Amino acid sequence: RYSLWSAIGLSIAIAVGYENFHELLRGAEAMDNHFRTAPLEQNIPVIMALLGIWYNDYYNIHRYAVIPYDQYLKFLPAYLQQLDMESNGKSVRLDNRKITDYATGPALFGGAGTDVQHSFFQLLHQGTEPVPVDFIIPAVSHNEIGKHHEILLANVLAQAEALMKGKTPDEAAAELRAAGKD
């Protein structure tokens, strides 16, 4: 999980080009600096960690989805799955005592939004248990095709709003009646 920062990074630099690899390192350094210097209420890694603990321990939610709406990020959920679940998938403390008083981490899943929104989104929208979701979309597309990115952004925002607000059965029935589909 940390090997890209070591000598193995050479193979990555060769594959993506030194300038791209250097840009990755600059981004990592910027995030490290943000983590070290940002006030807690603005510290993105701290806020994300606290949300994870809150969902896991307070709400007893033991699953989490990462949905990038960009094909260049389609492997990000698998990478995060390995990083997070391997790190947190422990049942024994450093002193060899069994962990019994808290869950060590959620099951993480996901995939590229356009690929997975017709597979497990039914569970996200209508399942009986909540699933925290992080939607990711770049501000600017690397492959701008007409209005495709604008449409994709609208889709992501609509998915997020639907999950955030939802509808009661009465609201859904009223919408169907208003559309003449009762």
Model regions and ranges:
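Active-site phosphate/pyrophosphate-binding segments
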Residues: 1-146, 166
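Acidic, Ser/Thr-rich peripheral helices and adjacent loops at domain boundaries
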Residues: 144-181
